[in-house]
Amino acid sequence: MLYQQIQSNKRRTIVLLFVFFILVALVGAAVGYLLLNSLETGVVAAIVIGAIYTIIMVSNSTNVVMAMNHGHEIKNADQAPELWHTVEDMAMVAQVPMPRVFIIDDDSPNAFATGNNPEHSAVAATTGLLKIMNRSELEGVIAHEMSHVRNYDIRISTIALALAAAITLLTNIGGNWWFWGSGDRRRNDDRNGGGGLQILLLVFSILMMVLAPLAAAAIQMAISRNREYLADAGSAELTRNPQGLISALRKLGNAQPMKDVDSSSAALYISNPLKNKERLFDTHPPIEERIDRLEKM
C-alpha cells in the first residue's frame, strides 16, 4: 500500500512540476512582451533563468537552504547528542545514508529535510523542537523527515523552490521595469495605434505579473500537501509508533510561528513556520486532518 502511495505521489508531483515549468514560460512571455515587445525572447530567457536557478539549487541545495534559514551544522554527537543519535537511528531504519545535521536557533518547534538525494541530504531541527519533544515525539518528527529523504521529496521540493524563486525574480523585473521604466512608452504606443491584439497581450502580461506568484504558491502548496501526508505515513511505518508523531503534531499545532524564517522555504518544514501570519496559501494540510489520518492507521 505504501509503495502504491509513493508511486501515486510521484506521478502527481511530475504533473505539478510540468505545470510549474509552463508557468515559468508564460511569465517569461509576459516579461518579454512588456520589456522587449517579444514573447519568444521572454520565453527563452525565462527557461534559461529557471534552468540556472534549478541547477544551482539542486547542486548546492543544502548549503543554500540552510543559509537562508540560519542553520548551523553540528559535526558530531557531542554537540547535540539526542538529535544526532535520533537522526542516526532513523536513517538506519529508513536504510538511507546518515544526513548532515543542522540546528536552527529558534524557540518555535519545527524541523525540515533538504538536499538532492539520500546520499546528499540534511536534516534541521530548531532549538525549540529539542526543548519540548520527548524521545518518541522526536523520533516521530525525525522519521517524518527521513521519509522525505527516502521518497526523494527533498529533490522535488528543491526544484519547486527554485522555480518559485525564478518566477518571483521575473515578475519583479517585469513589474518594476515596466511600471517605473518603460511603462509610459508602452502606454503611449498603445494609444497611438495599438490594435486589439496588442491590448490583449498587454492585459495578459500585466495579469501574469500579478497572478503568477499566487499560482506558484498554489502549486507549491499542492506539492507540499502530497509530501506531508505521505511522510506522516512513512514516519508511522519507520517508528511503528504513530502515537509519537501524533503527540508531536499536537505540540507543533499549538506552537508560535518562527521568528526569523525564509518564507520561500516554508513548505519544507514539518509544520507551517508562518502560522498566525497572514498567508493567502497554506503549504501544509491542517494538523487535525493529519492526526486523524494517523489515528486511522
Curated annotation (Swiss-Prot):
Pfam families registered for this protein in UniProt: Peptidase_M48 (PF01435)
> According to its UniProt record, which residues of this chain constitute the active site?
E145
Alphabetized UniProt keyword annotations: Cell membrane, Hydrolase, Membrane, Metal-binding, Metalloprotease, Protease, Transmembrane, Transmembrane helix, Zinc
User: Where is it located?
Assistant: Cell membrane
InterPro entries the UniProt entry points to: HtpX_protease, Pept_M48_protease_HtpX, Peptidase_M48
Lineage: superkingdom: Bacteria
**One BP annotation, GO:** proteolysis
Gene Ontology cellular component terms for the protein in this record: plasma membrane
The portions of this protein that span the membrane are 14-34, 38-58, 159-179, 199-219
Q: Where is the signal peptide?
A: none
Record has Transmembrane helix as a keyword:
yes
Q: What is its EC number?
A: 3.4.24.-
Query: Is Transmembrane helix one of the keywords?
Result: yes
- Give the note describing cofactor binding and stoichiometry: Binds 1 zinc ion per subunit.
Give the HAMAP family listed for this entry: Pept_M48_protease_HtpX
The UniProt family comment states: Belongs to the peptidase M48B family.
Full protein name: Protease HtpX homolog
The protein's organism comes out as Leuconostoc mesenteroides subsp. mesenteroides (strain ATCC 8293 / DSM 20343 / BCRC 11652 / CCM 1803 / JCM 6124 / NCDO 523 / NBRC 100496 / NCIMB 8023 / NCTC 12954 / NRRL B-1118 / 37Y)
Q: Which gene is the coding source of this polypeptide chain?
A: htpX
